[in-house]
């Protein structure tokens, strides 16, 4: 301007001496904590998304890449996020997340039981997910007890055996969905062996040597009955891997030959906490799976939307099946046979305990893993607990996990009292078939002919919930599983003590209660 004579020499000298720095806008402190589970998890999820976008642009299939190729795309995605000034919007509710971190700091010690891993570490680790049932949004999570001590994210990155939490997802749910069982069907709970002759170890001796209902089998998490149901499911559907092929694969469970093993219903297959939480989300969402997600939107530095989450969901179970499973899983929590979660919660917060809680526990061999997953109509909250390096815990590990989870849920309630949808209920879907059945057989009451003798089904009647077809007519071999001697024992020991005059019931099984 001076050379163009637009300003005088005096003005030019004054301008040169002026400190321009004082007019610069101050650098804003980014509201990002770059140390911790949250930062690294959000970044990793964003990198996965950008990788997929880049591969799509290049018309490259992820499955066709070797590890070197995947590493190259990952590095490219990380550079792209930084160089393009991407803004990542996550689903995490900061208040919820902070509350969960405070809760694990305050109550994580409840998990400790004095056991140690091979390195002498006595801290019992945990991974927790809080998921919105309707959308699959991850509202908050706990990656571990202390990031400074252990950076392994136990909610997302640690695959562990799932134990009995898989039973509703892979066996009872599909069997109800296919009309093979109803809520009060009878299942053999007699000592037995695997097909290869190995002795079968049950989870408890409660109600052994009899036929138990589906509801009671879940309440006590019996092992023998669920294997019988799974074998019947595989036989009737003509597919040893039916549950995975038609249910689990739709919910992104990891593919494994082990799903076809006879012992698969006991939870020997490994997966992570977020995947298992997602399975229960589907049941709590009327059978509709919404894939868990943490990234809502990614925009570049010009405001252009690079990615936005969209998911129409997948109907995995029928609404009838999901509602029956929730009715059964409510009994699991209310009975407190396998978890003290609800009684503990009632002592901490009776109002929160009045929410409609459903859920399932799980333990693995030598108590190396302890699981508890609970849902209300609005959210699903999960917990895995165990040593970072797999090692046995004590038999109290399940109670410890239930105690910890009750305190975690209570803390979340005070952070957001609307979170758990207190007052909302899991209702039976209108399509559920309500069959009047004999308590003795779990099938429709009526006359039975065996060895030339004709007699009526003994005992009282009850209602069994079916998603398909309704209860069959009672037969001598009424249950799922069991040998000839098991049936002879059951009929011989129990039938004489039951009332055999069921004429008042015989006329009811043809009424339209099975609709």
What is the meaning of each model-derived region?
Residues 493-515:
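Ser/Thr/Gly/Pro-rich low-complexity, disordered linker/stalk segments of secreted
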Residues 2, 25-30, 83-91, 153-161, ...:
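Second-shell loop/turn segments in exported
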Residues 2-87, 91, 249, 263-264:
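Non-catalytic, structured segments within soluble enzyme domains
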Residues 28-30, 181-244, 261, 301-331:
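Conserved catalytic neighborhood of penicillin-recognizing serine enzymes
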Residues 90-115, 130, 141, 148-158, ...:
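A penicillin-recognizing enzyme superfamily signal
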Residues 2-30, 79-156, 165-168, 182:
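Periplasmic/cell-envelope proteins involved in peptidoglycan metabolism and beta-lactam response
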Residues 199-201, 234-280:
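Mid-domain, small-residue-enriched loop/turn segments at the edges of structured enzyme/sensor domains
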Residues 1, 100, 136, 161-189, ...:
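Active-site SXXK
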């Amino acid at each position: 301007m001076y050379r163009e004579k637009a300003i005088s020499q005096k003005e030019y000298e004054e301008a040169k001496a002026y400190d321009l720095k004082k007019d610069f806008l101050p650098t804003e402190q980014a509201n990002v904590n770059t140390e911790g589970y949250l930062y690294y998890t959000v970044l990793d999820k964003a990198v996965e998304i950008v990788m997929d976008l880049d591969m799509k642009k290049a018309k490259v299939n992820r499955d066709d890449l070797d590890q070197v190729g995947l590493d190259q795309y990952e590095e490219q995605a990380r550079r792209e996020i930084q160089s393009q000034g991407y803004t990542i919007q996550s689903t995490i509710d900061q208040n919820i997340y902070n509350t969960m971190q405070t809760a694990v700091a305050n109550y994580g010690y409840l998990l400790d039981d004095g056991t140690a891993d091979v390195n002498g570490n006595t801290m019992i680790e945990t991974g927790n997910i809080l998921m919105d049932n309707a959308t699959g949004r991850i509202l908050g999570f706990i990656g571990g007890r202390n990031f400074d001590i252990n950076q392994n994210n136990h909610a997302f990155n640690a695959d562990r055996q799932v134990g009995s939490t898989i039973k509703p997802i892979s066996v009872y749910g599909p069997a109800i969905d296919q009309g093979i069982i109803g809520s009060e069907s009878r299942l053999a709970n007699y000592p037995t062996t695997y097909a290869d002759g190995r002795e079968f170890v049950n989870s408890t001796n409660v109600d052994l040597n009899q036929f138990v209902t589906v509801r009671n089998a879940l309440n006590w998490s019996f092992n023998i009955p669920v294997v019988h149901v799974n074998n019947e499911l595989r036989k009737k559907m003509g597919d040893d891997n039916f549950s995975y092929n038609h249910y689990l694969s739709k919910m992104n469970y990891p593919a494994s030959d082990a799903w076809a093993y006879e012992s698969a219903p006991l939870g020997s297959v490994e997966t992570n906490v977020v995947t298992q939480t997602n399975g229960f989300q589907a049941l709590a969402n009327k059978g509709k799976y919404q894939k868990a997600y943490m990234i809502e939107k990614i925009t570049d530095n010009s405001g252009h939307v690079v990615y936005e989450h969209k998911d129409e969901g997948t109907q995995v179970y029928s609404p009838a099946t999901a509602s029956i499973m929730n009715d059964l899983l409510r009994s699991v929590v209310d009975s407190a046979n396998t978890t003290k979660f609800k009684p503990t919660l009632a002592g901490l917060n009776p109002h929160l305990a009045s929410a409609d809680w459903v859920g399932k526990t799980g333990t693995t061999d030598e108590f190396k893993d302890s699981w508890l997953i609970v849902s209300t109509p609005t959210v699903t909250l999960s917990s895995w607990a165990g040593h970072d390096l797999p090692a046995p815990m004590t038999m109290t590990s399940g109670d410890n996990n239930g105690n910890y989870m009750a305190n975690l849920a209570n803390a979340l309630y005070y952070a957001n009292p609307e979170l758990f949808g207190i007052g909302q209920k899991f209702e039976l879907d209108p399509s559920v078939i309500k069959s009047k059945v004999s308590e003795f057989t779990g099938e429709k009451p009526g006359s039975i002919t065996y060895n030339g003798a004709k007699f009526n089904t003994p005992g009282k009647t009850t209602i069994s919930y079916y998603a398909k077809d309704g209860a069959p007519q009672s037969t001598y071999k009424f249950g799922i599983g069991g040998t000839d001697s098991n049936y002879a024992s059951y009929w011989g020991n129990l039938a004489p003590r039951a009332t055999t005059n069921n004429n008042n019931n015989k006329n009811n099984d043809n009424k339209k209660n099975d609709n």
